[in-house]
Regions:
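Active-site rim helix/loop that mediates acceptor-substrate recognition in acyltransferases
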Residues: 13, 20-59, 164-201
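Conserved beta-strand in the GNAT
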Residues: 47, 53-61, 69, 74, ...
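Conserved catalytic-core motifs of GNAT/GCN5-like acyltransferases
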Residues: 62, 105-108, 125-139, 265-279
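A conserved beta-turn-beta hairpin within the catalytic core of GNAT-like acetyltransferases
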Residues: 62-70, 80, 208-221, 268-272
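Conserved GNAT acetyl-CoA-binding A-motif
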Residues: 68, 95-111, 241-251
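Conserved acetyl-CoA-binding loop-helix of GNAT-fold acetyltransferases
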Residues: 75-77, 81-95, 117, 121, ...
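Conserved active-site alpha-helix within GNAT-family acetyltransferase domains
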Residues: 82, 86, 98, 110-128, ...
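Amide-forming acyltransferase catalytic core, primarily the GNAT-like/NAT-type
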Residues: 122-214
Length: 280
């Protein structure tokens, strides 16, 4: 059996979608992000072939803070357990060395022993746990009581109002199940993308955005202050943008956040997620 890894090409699209359909039938999004993954200069989209057959894929993405995010690692079920996942990880470490990346991260479900076990073998350690919550967006924007929220585009102001969330949110801000390290570099990036909102009157702050597929979900990264006003504003933005749902990943240790989300009729994912880190 000959395993070869190479960069993905446009003509791999259908095969990559087939791999995802077989490997993770309950988590399918590569059809929507294939072109983005292929064109991103901040990362490398890789496929695995066994004796010339495309059987796996994986993505290495450089993050705003200079770390790397490992994602979309998929292998056809009939080819799992043959060392293909290990080949991807070895390739990720090679890319990291070539790109001067010293920290890599990935996420998985707390019940996914195989995914965690593979990361364990390569020195990854659990950094934090997160719980997912979601709420269908209203079809129409609500009342105008949240019109005092304004976008924050100044990097210094963005850093000043977001970094205090670091401890409570255990160091990460999550969008599209991508765990961004909450650092000044991320604050700058979010400010540039128009994802930060502040209501100076009530000292409320919320981040809203999507790394991809904004029509599917508007992601709440962090929020605080008048939490009811924050969530009302998020619902209004979701309706305005015609997105299907609001999504929020938060630390289970923040019991007050779960209470707030529960009170606002959010539904919770069946199991939690973990983010794992390695320094290389």
């Amino acid at each position: 059996m000959k395993i070869e890894l190479r960069r993905a090409r446009q003509e791999d699209r259908e095969k990559v979608i087939e791999v995802e359909s077989g490997a993770t039938p309950n988590l399918s999004y590569l059809a929507n992000v294939f072109d983005m993954f292929l064109s991103e200069k901040s990362g490398e989209f890789i496929v695995a072939e066994v004796d010339g057959k495309l059987v796996g894929c994986g993505k290495f993405t450089k993050m705003p803070d200079g770390s790397a995010w490992l994602e979309a690692l998929r292998v056809l079920p009939e080819y799992q357990g043959m060392g293909i996942g290990k080949c991807f990880y070895k390739q990720f470490f090679d890319i990291a060395r070539h790109r001067d990346v010293t920290t890599m991260r990935m996420y998985t479900g707390v019940k996914n022993a195989v995914s965690k076990g593979l990361a364990d073998q390569f020195g990854f350690n659990v950094s934090a746990a997160y719980r997912g919550a979601w709420l269908p967006c209203p079809q129409e924007a609500g009342r105008d009581s949240t019109d005092t929220f304004r976008q924050v585009t100044d990097p210094d102001r963005a850093t000043a109002i977001l970094m205090p969330f670091f401890e409570k949110w255990t160091g990460f801000l999550v969008m599209n199940r991508t765990f961004f390290a909450l650092k000044p570099a991320l604050c700058l990036s979010l400010a540039q993308k128009g994802c930060i909102y502040e209501d100076p009157r009530s000292r409320s702050v919320i981040t809203l955005g999507a790394r991809f597929m904004p029509e599917q979900a508007l992601h709440i990264g962090v929020f605080g202050g008048d939490t009811e006003a924050c969530l009302e504003f998020a619902a209004k933005e979701g309706a305005t943008k015609c997105t299907k749902r609001l999504s929020c990943l938060f630390p289970p240790s923040a019991v007050d956040l779960q209470d707030i989300l529960t009170h606002n009729d959010f539904r919770f994912e069946a199991s939690d997620f973990i983010v794992m880190t390695v320094h290389c």
